[in-house]
């Protein structure tokens, strides 16, 4: 009888990724975690629209954290984002891809009207 350690299965991909530009210098991302077993999330960004761009990892968050702020964006630029869950077995498939255009510098989002 052999003693084999089994690796966990790959985590499920995050869903419902959204992106909101805040002024010209930040993009806020939020998503929904699907299932357990992940050790965190990897955030990827590409310049331009859709998955035609080359995605690069720009950051990560721990398990059960479902938001990220990208403070390294430039004004008046289009970015695409996607998120992967990960664990000891590897990365999940990517989330949906979202695109966001940052406004010109100094532009603030509209205030909520009460």
Region annotations inferred by a language model:
Residues 41-76, 88-94:
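Recognizes extended acidic, P/S/T-rich segments that occur
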Residues 1-37, 75, 88-114:
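Pro/Thr/Ser/Gly-rich low-complexity, intrinsically disordered linker/stalk tracts
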């Amino acid at each position: 009888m052999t003693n084999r350690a089994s690796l966990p299965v790959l985590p499920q991909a995050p869903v419902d990724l959204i992106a909101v530009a805040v002024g010209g210098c930040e993009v806020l991302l939020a998503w929904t975690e699907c299932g357990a077993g992940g050790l965190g999330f990897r955030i990827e960004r590409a310049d331009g629209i859709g998955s035609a761009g080359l995605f690069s990892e720009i950051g990560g968050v721990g398990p059960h954290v479902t938001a990220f702020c990208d403070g390294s964006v430039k004004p008046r630029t289009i970015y695409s984002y996607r998120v992967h869950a990960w664990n000891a077995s590897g990365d999940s498939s990517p989330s949906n891809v979202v695109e966001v255009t940052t406004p010109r510098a100094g532009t603030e989002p509209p205030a909520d009207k009460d």
